[in-house]
Regions:
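Terminal, non-catalytic protein-protein interaction segments that mediate quaternary/complex assembly
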Residues: 1-166
Length: 166
């Protein structure tokens, strides 16, 4: 059986609209939603080989605030090489915003208005196209609910924006 991700990819191919621009031809759908349960995600990750060790190392480097691309390369991660020697306005910067937000949530115990915006800001020194992520933390019946909207810098290549609820 085809998983939900492949089903929506099939919808894009079969009934998606076509857009031509200076970067080529893309197919897309509007107003579609892909909801994935933990089982769906497990199915996706288990059905494809992924570099789990590299992803874990990369996340650890992000969380440490590491910006030197050479450190990522030492961990066997070379997909940031195109950025130059230093990651500017990227994931390590984003992770720095989380501790103050977590402290605010613990201090104020507010049900809403707990969010952080990650934006490849215009005018800021950057070696990457802007990405946009908005992460909102809500407290619902004593449990933490996370909603995240993410638009990749690769959106111009036809990659989707994603909304996650965890």
């Amino acid at each position: 059986m085809m998983n939900k991700y492949y089903e929506i990819l099939k919808q894009i191919i079969v009934s998606g609209k076509t857009q031509h621009n200076r970067k080529g031809c893309i197919r897309y759908l509007l107003n579609e939603q892909l909801s994935l349960s933990p089982v769906d995600l497990l199915d996706m990750f288990e059905s494809h080989s992924i570099a789990r060790k590299k992803l874990k190392s990369e996340l650890q480097l992000f969380m440490q605030g590491e910006r030197q691309v050479e450190r990522y390369r030492e961990a066997g991660i070379n997909w940031w090489d195109y950025c130059g020697s230093v990651l500017v306005n990227s994931y390590p910067t984003y992770f720095e915003k989380l501790p103050p937000l977590i402290a605010k949530i613990n201090r104020e115990k507010r049900n809403s208005k707990n969010y952080v915006l990650f934006l490849g800001e215009t005018g800021a020194e950057s070696n990457q196209a802007p990405c946009l992520s908005l992460v909102q933390f809500q407290i619902d019946e004593g449990e933490l609910v996370l909603s995240a909207y993410q638009r990749s810098s690769d959106a111009n290549l036809g990659l989707p924006a994603d909304i996650y609820h965890l």
